[in-house]
Amino acid sequence: GGPGQELTLSYAISGKKAPGCVCLSIDSEGTDGTTKVAGGITDSTSYDAAEAKGINVFDALRGHACFEALDAIGDAVFTGNTGTNLCDLNIMYVPELPGKPRKGSRIRSVHARQIIDCKCRPMVEVDVITEDGSIGTAAAPTGSSVGMYESFVLRDNDPAEYNGLSVHKAVANVNDIIAPALIGMDAMDQAAIDRCMIELDGTENKTNLGGNAIYSVSVACYRAAAASCKRPLYDYIAGGRIKTVPIPSFNVLNGGMNAGIRQAFNEFIVMPYRASDIEQAVEIAVKVFNRLGTVIRAYTGAEPRVGGSYGWCAPSEDPEVCLDLIQKAIDDCGYSEQCAFALDCAMTEMYDREHKTYYLNGSQVTNDELVAYVKRLTEKYNFVFIEDMLDEDDWDGFVKAHREITRTYIIADDLTVSNPARIRRAYELKAIDGFILKPNQVGTITEALAAHKFASEHGMFSVTSGRSGGVVGDVVMDLAVGLQIPFIKNGCPRSGERIDKLNFLMRVKDNYPGCHMAKIDDIVRF
């Protein structure tokens, strides 16, 4: 550190470097305060100039850096006498660098076992251990409603164990087939690891080895790589400063068939998008959810029932009645100005393929009628987004909805299943504004990141979401923070894995001074 460091680094960069040498200048708390990247020379380009030109500084580093250089303090250049002391120096590690593996990050062992998810269904869990002793553990959640284009969940179909839901075959595939192929590979080369498993499987939807087997290994390797760098996974993903945590949204009312009432729409969601901070957003969710129980009791004259996703069961077939009850709970709590709605319609579950109609409010309707109905809802209520308002194969319906509904965002889940090819098709057809990012749907971290990258480069949203059969410590939270996603689906403020996600966001915010909850006031459409 010091006044001369930029000049020295500029000279070093312009000179002839030995193969594999990287020159980095990184300030932390110097006398002139915290700077970004060396005030900042990197690859002969200042940080501000790179930012103005749209150059990603971390991409610039990827072009020159190698693992050995970052491991060896002797490869760095230090000058000056008033800046950063050696003991304060922050060595910046850039993930997925080309070249040789970082010392110690090679995979030493891969081991799978059967555990149970938060709905007490068996799932695959995997431990990956690197040569330096770093451990990554991950499990594969599953949803209650699963799109037909998702990666295949391999189960044993043995009625004698968990009614056929056990996953011993998938566990064996990890231990006997995947593990031998990955041992010795670099845990930090995520793309190579995922490519290896996809090639071992040899099918489009990962039906041979099981998407649940492949996904668990993929995430475990991701975690092991971050652990090898001694960084939280979300920080490893971000590659830079964490500026925001996403706005959580809460599924407070569950649709489907409950207590004899068939509510077509699956999830009625509250988003406290104008909360002052993440702590207030969580408090709003808890208070509104609890108050909603009282409001439902007054409406029905009976105790509210708990739905399949732990929200309250919808007390009416009429979506407007449900929305009005939620709005009353919001108003009663004094949060009318802070909250908006979202909907997950999950209309694939309500689609009659033979007659090509949808069940809605006691009747069968065409996609034209469904689009017109939802459009009227968006004109009456404020929605941040509406998800899966049509069947997973109703491309024409989605195009029509996207064209005609302009007061909210049209988001897809079953239509896109986090698959880059399907997201590209939806973009080219102008069918959606964004998609729900559930990495286990597509089956590997690499494919999930590719889906997010395509969406962000083409002006679409990625909205991370857990699964109803969730896990504690879900990687979707690391992705949401690391990718700086503006808003997410969290589920209702009840049950351990959902509360864990909320606590995760509050911890991240607390650990990064200046970090705040994302703001979307300037992008909502109402």
Describe the residue ranges of each PLM region.
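Active-site histidine-anchored catalytic micro-motif
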Residues: G1-E68, I73-V77, G83-N85
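Conserved phosphate/anionic-ligand binding catalytic regions in large, soluble enzymes, centered on
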Residues: G1-G2, D75-D88, I115-V126, N205-A226, ...
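Short beta-strand elements
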Residues: I13, I91-Y93, V124-D132, G136-T142, ...
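Flexible, glycine/charged-enriched surface loops at secondary-structure junctions
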Residues: A18-S25, V57-L61, T79-N81, D186-I193, ...
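Short, Gly/Pro- and small/polar-rich lid/capping loops
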Residues: P98-V124
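Metal- or metallocofactor-binding catalytic centers and their adjacent structured scaffolds
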Residues: P141-R231, V282, G311
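Mobile "lid/hinge" segments at catalytic clefts and subdomain interfaces of large enzymes
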Residues: K243-R305, Y310
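Catalytic core of soluble alpha/beta enzymes
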Residues: A302-E303, P319-F526
